[in-house]
């Protein structure tokens, strides 16, 4: 599928057309501007029609071999005789056969018949019990034979050097099938990618084991290292002004000044002394 898309992109790049243009030639344009030059050995105006032996392939394999197109595909192909001395073409394919339907239609160019258009339907299986499919082909051949096949005459298997074929699926089943195939491939790729990942059950969740913060706040840490001054009993005097101290002194008698002195140290008993 990727190769087919790449060929389409290459052909579109060679065409160098503005966005929005599509290749939808008429019957007359196909015969006059593509089939006639190719049968005469001249190059086609644009390289968007692949050359292959179409009758060696099943129709659903041909879109991958086309150079251009998404819903209809164009091919140049030789055509062989079914029998060496007959004029009937060999319509056998890889796993089935093409069966003509309806009458031949002339393709006019400048008021003259330049080619013949034939419609064919693909049957899967062997004739006459093949199963009809939705694959349709329009085959264009020149009204006047020429080239090496005509020169070979009777007895040669080659009936036409080149005919031009337009292939499409009546119900567009091929495009739907390709869309389903791409979806399945995408799902398979996603599943394969998922299998290569580490199962979530084996993934250690770092959030389940948060790192412990052993650091202390800066202020608390500094306070813990610095020695602390013990509170003194006369610290309350340090906060008083001179006027307050003078006023306090005038109120107190000399014998009461002892209250301003610090209390006597507590008498301590030596360790091990008996308790009475």
From Swiss-Prot:
Expression across tissues is: Expressed in leaf blades.
Indicate the segments forming the NAC domain, all copies.
17-170
Pfam families, per the entry: NAM
Q: What GO molecular function terms would the record report?
A: DNA binding
Q: Does the keyword Transcription regulation apply?
A: yes
Q: Does the keyword Transcription regulation feature in the UniProt annotation?
A: yes
Question: What does the UniProt keyword field contain?
Answer: DNA-binding, Nucleus, Transcription, Transcription regulation
Q: What does this protein do?
A: Probable transcription factor involved in stress response.
Please state what the protein is called.
Answer: NAC domain-containing protein 67
């Amino acid at each position: 599928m990727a190769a087919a898309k790449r060929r389409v992109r290459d052909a579109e790049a060679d065409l160098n057309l503005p966005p929005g243009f599509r290749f939808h030639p008429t019957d007359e344009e196909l015969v006059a501007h593509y089939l006639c030059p190719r049968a005469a050995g001249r190059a086609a105006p644009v390289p968007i029609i692949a050359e292959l032996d179409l009758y060696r392939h099943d129709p659903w394999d041909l879109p991958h071999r086309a150079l251009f197109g998404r819903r209809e595909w164009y091919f140049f192909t030789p055509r062989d005789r079914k029998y060496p001395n007959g004029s009937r073409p060999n319509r056998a394919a890889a796993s089935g056969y093409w069966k003509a339907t309806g009458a031949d239609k002339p393709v006019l160019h400048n008021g003259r018949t330049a080619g013949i258009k034939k419609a064919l339907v693909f049957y899967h299986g062997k004739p006459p019990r093949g199963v009809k499919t939705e694959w349709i082909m329009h085959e264009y051949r020149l009204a006047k034979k020429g080239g090496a096949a005509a020169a070979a005459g009777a007895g040669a298997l080659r009936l036409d050097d080149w005919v031009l074929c337009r292939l499409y699926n009546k119900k567009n089943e091929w495009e739907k099938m390709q869309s389903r195939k791409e979806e399945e491939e995408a799902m398979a790729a996603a599943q394969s990618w998922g299998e290569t990942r580490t199962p979530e059950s084996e993934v250690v969740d770092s959030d389940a084991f948060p790192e412990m913060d052993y650091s202390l706040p800066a202020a608390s840490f500094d306070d813990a290292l610095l020695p602390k001054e013990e509170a003194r009993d006369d610290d309350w005097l340090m906060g008083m002004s001179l006027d307050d101290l003078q006023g306090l002194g005038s109120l107190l008698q000399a014998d009461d000044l002892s209250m301003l002195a610090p209390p006597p140290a507590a008498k301590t008993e030596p360790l091990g002394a008996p308790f009475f």
